[in-house]
Amino acid sequence: MLYLYDSITIVSRLQEEFWKVMGSDYLPEMEQNGMRLLGMFMMGIHYNENLALWELDDWATLDRIQELQDKHPLMKAWQREAVDYITDFTGKVLQPAPFSPTLAKLKKGDYKSTIYLHTLAKVHPGKEDEYMEAVGKELKPMARRWGMKLVGCYKAVAGTASSGEVINIWTAGNIHGEWVKIRAKSLKDPAYKKWEIEAGKWRPKVVYRFLYGLVPYSPLRTPFLQEPAAPEEVRTVAMPEVEWK
């Protein structure tokens, strides 16, 4: 499996309209051609920044999607339409850890959450696989005790992003009060204190951000949105800066 990580900056007042248009005009064509939406999120701290995370079977699928976007008239029309909504866009290709759940597994399990925790670790060159293995063996079971589930663990493919990027995404509760309790449990856990010391040898820097699952057609989303949901059911919430240290 491969994953496509699209960071999209949207005109703030048009964000919900963009979600609707993307769901009707872009998503069906992509999924028909093998690019499956795993999650569409609003990102804190910049609230008009969105993350679209896609799952693909292999590099051949990615090549086919690229050719489709370059040549297909419908995709050309979408690109012209998207200019009205998007002010910036960056993408990168991710490779999953062996234990990272696939979309099929996520759909079968209980991974819906209003809040997800996104961590971006800057790992020393050549240590990405070693760090991800430690996440799977040590941090994943630890976090589950606190009430978090791993949604994905990925490393960025060289040439598509800064070197040494490892991204983890976790469920983090349905209200901010639940996150506060999760964080409190982690800070009292001696195993987590040990992990932070140990993890420092792999990653000198890690950035934490909240993701908000507020898009009705996203497989990863708040359980308070039923499927299918009307566009007016999508609503923003107050979002503080994430802190976990």
Task: Give short role names for the model-derived ranges.
Residues 7-12, 98-177, 218-221, 229-245:
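Surface-exposed interaction/gating patches
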Residues 47-49, 160-161:
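Short secondary-structure boundary/hinge segments and terminal tails
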Residues 51-55, 166:
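Charged, often glycine-rich, active-site loop that binds/positions anionic groups
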